[in-house]
């Protein structure tokens, strides 16, 4: 599809700019992909594209911190690839995604990184970056982590505590990985579920004849997420390095994060659109396809309170930035687990509907202000991953990634109208009020009037420098705590014989 405007230059008039600290009426001029001027009554130069944003909000382009496009996983490949996935992203107002390189155990991280980057560079329709998963530990991994940080623009590494016998690492390996993250100034991310207990829970369910999707949640209740979340935070804090819990899916896990934050631990939590927009009761649906569509890990929780409580945490700033974990599989792929839920490829959609789901469940419920919405869907992610204010803010010099948002327009989410490749939408039938009517990437319109106008492969890889704001003050915290570790000077122990012989 040809982009309607290749110049990266556009004038947006009469909108209300919303950043995470304030909002104000203004025109915005983007030139060659960079925001050039923000002021009232900017006169358009000859030939410049002008868009009227009267009664609309201008938001910083959304940032999705967690996607898995075309991920080889559980014997298949997720169907939203970097082209379709980023089309769906911009159709919902997201203009920057961070995907995951996931090396197989024993595979070179650099080799896997190069493969993922090749896949992405050929297809992305918006800017992107890459986290790297650490699925094994060795001197080689340690060396390659340094190269990824110093030469490839990676500042985040993910450990899986789940997926025993595939991605899962031990506590001891995680300890060494976290130490390495600290040395390199990279944030340690964790998929926090007790993988050994999940493995036992899965066996138990199958032995009991519970083979359907409901067995997925029953085998890995939220206690296993909360326990692993606590363990990951304790290990990270023992190293005194910032830790980021991905896809926080339960009240239990959120409570653990809150407890440690109150004690001054540098921990961040990422809720996802699924956990903020639906609940896990769908896994008990009598239609197998419907139930299997909601299978992901950690499970979307059946407790109906969860989505509201997670939104409350997000509003208070006790959870930080919203991802999606977009990892989609069609019916025939999910059916690989039709007789055994442990074989259902884990993953759901989210990248297109994320911002409207957060607006509907956050702003329209009175829990989030406009500014808090921007924080949750864009700027906090940019800060944590050290690309603020290039991304996550509408200001002079920032990237021209802008969403024209209509807070009063509604739509009903459906697989029949979404832009994903997947044949199911976990938000099916949900009416949302608050949608992206125009999405601008690097000063070019890529979504408008309900139509995409992307240029495949036009997105850029954005390197993320180490030692971002998440590391501020970490050394001092470490120093103060280490000063408390003192040895006691005492006389050497003497048993009675030694005592008598010295008299
Ligand atoms: O665990 C993840 O984040 C990846 C493998 C996607 N699948 C999922 O169920 N979350
Ligand atoms: Zn995960
Ligand atoms: Zn994931």
Swiss-Prot record:
One of its GO terms (molecular function) is dihydropyrimidinase activity. Keywords: Hydrolase, Metal-binding, Zinc. The keyword Hydrolase applies. The modification N6-carboxylysine is found at residue 158. Substrate binds at residues 163, 346. Zn(2+) 2 binds at residues 158, 191, 247. It holds the Pfam family Amidohydro_1. Its EC number is 3.5.2.2. Its cofactor is Zn(2+). Carboxylation allows a single lysine to coordinate two zinc ions. GO terms for cellular component: cytosol. Gene3D superfamilies: Metal-dependent hydrolases (3.20.20.140), Urease, subunit C, domain 1 (2.30.40.10). SUPFAM superfamilies: Composite domain of metallo-dependent hydrolases (SSF51338), Metallo-dependent hydrolases (SSF51556). Zn(2+) 1 binds at residues 66, 68, 158, 325. It catalyses: 5,6-dihydrouracil + H2O = 3-(carbamoylamino)propanoate + H(+). Binds 2 Zn(2+) ions per subunit. GO terms for biological process: pyrimidine nucleobase catabolic process. Homotetramer. Catalyzes the second step of the reductive pyrimidine degradation, the reversible hydrolytic ring opening of dihydropyrimidines. Can catalyze the ring opening of 5,6-dihydrouracil to N-carbamyl-alanine and of 5,6-dihydrothymine to N-carbamyl-amino isobutyrate. Belongs to the metallo-dependent hydrolases superfamily. Hydantoinase/dihydropyrimidinase family. PANTHER family: COLLAPSIN RESPONSE MEDIATOR PROTEIN, HYDRANTOINASE/DIHYDROPYRIMIDINASE FAMILY MEMBER. This is Dihydropyrimidinase.
């Amino acid at each position: 599809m040809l982009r309607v405007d290749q110049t990266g230059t556009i004038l947006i008039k009469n909108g209300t700019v919303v950043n995470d600290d304030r909002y104000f009426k203004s025109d915005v001029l983007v030139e060659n992909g960079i925001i050039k001027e923000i002021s009232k009554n900017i006169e358009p130069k000859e030939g410049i594209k002008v868009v009227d944003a009267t009664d609309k909000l201008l938001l910083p382009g959304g940032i999705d911190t967690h996607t898995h496009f075309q991920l080889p996983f559980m014997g298949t490949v997720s169907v939203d690839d970097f082209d379709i996935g980023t089309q769906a992203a911009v159709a919902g107002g997201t203009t920057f995604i961070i995907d995951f390189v996931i090396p197989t155990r024993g595979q070179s991280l650099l080799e896997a990184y190069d493969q993922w980057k090749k896949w992405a560079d050929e297809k992305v329709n918006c800017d992107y970056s890459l986290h790297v998963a650490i699925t094994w530990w060795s001197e080689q991994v340690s060396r390659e982590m340094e190269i990824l940080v110093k030469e490839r623009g990676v500042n985040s590494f993910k450990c899986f505590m789940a997926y025993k016998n595939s991605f899962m690492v031990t506590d001891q390996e995680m300890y060494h990985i976290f130490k390495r993250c600290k040395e390199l100034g990279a944030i340690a991310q964790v998929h926090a579920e007790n993988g050994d207990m999940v493995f036992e829970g899965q066996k138990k369910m199958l032995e009991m004849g519970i083979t359907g999707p409901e067995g997925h949640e029953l085998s890995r209740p939220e206690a296993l997420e909360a326990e692993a979340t606590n363990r990951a935070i304790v290990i990270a804090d023992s190293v005194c390095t910032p830790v980021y819990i991905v896809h926080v899916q339960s009240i239990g896990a959120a409570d653990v994060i809150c407890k440690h934050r109150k004690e001054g631990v540098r921990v961040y939590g990422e809720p996802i659109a699924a956990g903020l927009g639906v609940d896990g009761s769908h896994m008990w649906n009598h239609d197998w396809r419907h139930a299997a569509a909601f299978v992901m890990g950690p499970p979307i929780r059946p407790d109906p309170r969860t989505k509201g409580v997670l939104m409350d945490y997000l509003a208070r700033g006790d959870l930080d930035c919203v991802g999606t974990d977009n990892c989609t599989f069609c019916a025939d792929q999910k059916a690989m687990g039709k007789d055994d839920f442990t074989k259902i490829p884990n993953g759901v959609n989210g990248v297109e509907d994320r911002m409207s789901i957060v607006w509907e469940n956050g702003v329209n419920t009175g829990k989030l202000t406009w500014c808090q919405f921007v924080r949750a869907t864009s700027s906090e992610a940019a800060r944590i991953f050290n690309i603020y204010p290039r991304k996550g803010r509408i200001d002079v010099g920032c990237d021209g990634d802008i969403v024209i948002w209509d807070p009063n327009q509604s739509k009903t989410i459906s697989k029949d109208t979404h832009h994903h490749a997947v044949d199911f939408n976990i938000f099916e039938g949900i009416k949302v009020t608050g949608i992206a009517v125009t999405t601008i990437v690097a000063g070019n319109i890529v979504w408008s009037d309900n139509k995409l106008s992307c240029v495949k492969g036009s997105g850029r890889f954005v390197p993320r420098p180490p030692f971002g704001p998440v590391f501020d003050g970490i050394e001092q915290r470490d120093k103060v705590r280490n000063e408390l570790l003192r040895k006691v000077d005492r006389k050497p122990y003497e048993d009675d014989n030694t005592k008598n012989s010295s008299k």
